Design a protein with these regions (language model features):
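A nucleotide- and high-energy phosphate-metabolite-utilizing enzyme signature
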Residues: 1, 5-346, 350
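Ser/Thr-centric signal marking residues that sit
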Residues: 353
Length: 354
């Protein structure tokens, strides 16, 4: 291919080019075994252009027992990871060390988050950059581990969920502290909790997942409800700026609040009392079912546990069996979701002829 010839043309007599000449025959063979060899070769070329003049990079690939072959497998099978590797030569070195590919523990992630919180108490840009870079870094690590066969799918899903949990908890902590100071208050006028929903609540986060959440608050003792509500809304604004606002060039961490009470028509955050009233009086059957994956993820744990125990559990684990009307609603929702996911051609094929 033209990309391969270009690689050969750039080879000179330097140490780096000599190493590259040794590697390239095997590299081309390994890239050819991937799902998209052309993409793999293009990614290899980009890496060479960025790091190839550094003989240590190529020397590492030559001397490692597994790194070069793993790298080729990644480059020819994952556009996401190929692009990510082009930004960090450190990530390439992980491919030669199984221990470096293992997902970090939640405790280790929390230590890094606390360090960033202490360094960036007032600077939203620096804090947002550190959190988003951390997410990119750790998701990249886990993705490389999965494609290298170091971690299975279950461990990867758990590891990625831990990354999201740690970062969202730190971002919420930062937003609460920031708004408490901005409003000239000594203490937060409300406790705030985030409840994971959907795939995020079910600990099935992947590379491109949004974090589905419900946010709620509870006024502190003796605090005016209006003050607590104003504070909570400003905290949500700050949280969204940290995770997905235009504050940094690092990729956004998308949060999705559409599963909240009243959906897109409802407030982004509402009080515990308001949530309780809504779910007991107005929620549809599908909203009860959506609570099956609800779990506490960030913020005030006591508030989160109260929501799960007092509001979610009676609805998602009802004592009485579902009524015919409720079962009918669930079947309709299931049929609609399946229709939305199926290609149009398959829907037409499955429809009976008239």
């Amino acid at each position: 291919s033209s990309a391969a010839s270009d690689v050969y043309k750039r080879q000179g007599v330097s140490r780096a080019s000599k190493i590259n000449r040794i590697l390239l025959p095997a590299v081309l063979q390994w890239l050819g075994q991937g799902q998209n060899p052309d993409m793999g070769l293009l990614n290899w070329r980009k890496l060479e252009e960025r790091f190839g003049t550094d003989s240590e990079y190529l020397g590492f690939l030559r001397d490692s027992n597994s790194a070069a072959q793993r790298l080729c497998h990644v480059l020819s099978n994952s556009r996401f990871l190929g692009d990510a590797l082009n930004k960090s030569v450190e990530s390439v070195t992980w491919l030669g060390d199984d221990d470096a590919l293992i997902a970090r523990s939640r405790e280790s992630l929390d230590v890094q988050c606390r360090s960033s919180l202490s360094r960036n108490a007032d600077g939203i840009n620096d804090f947002a950059t550190s959190m988003r870079a951390m997410r990119r870094h750790e998701i990249e690590r886990i993705g490389l581990a999965r494609l290298s066969g170091v971690m299975d799918e279950t461990a990867c899903l758990t590891g990625m969920t831990d990354v999201y949990d740690a970062i969202i908890d730190a971002a919420l902590t930062w937003a609460i502290r920031y708004q408490t100071s901005a409003m000239g208050l000594g203490e937060p006028p409300a406790a705030i909790a985030a409840i994971g929903m959907g795939r995020y609540g079910g600990q099935e986060v992947n590379f491109s997942s949004d974090a589905d959440m419900i946010l709620l608050y509870r006024p502190a003792d003796g605090t005016d409800e209006q003050v607590a509500n104003q504070f909570a809304r400003k905290v949500v604004d700050a949280l969204r700026q940290v995770l997905q606002g235009p504050t940094t060039l690092e990729p956004k961490i998308e949060i999705d609040l559409d599963l909240r009470p009243e959906g897109k028509n409802g407030p982004l955050i509402r009080s515990y009392a308001s949530c309780r009233e809504y779910y007991s009086s107005w929620a549809n059957t599908w909203e009860h079912q959506a609570l099956l994956r609800a779990r506490f993820v960030a913020g005030d744990r006591a508030l989160g546990e109260d929501f799960l125990h007092d509001i979610a559990d009676p609805l998602r684990y009802p004592i009485s069996p579902l009524t015919d009307a409720q079962l009918g609603e669930i079947r309709k929702l299931k049929a609609r979701m399946e229709a939305e996911r199926l290609p149009l051609s398959l829907i037409h094929i499955s429809e009976p002829t008239r």
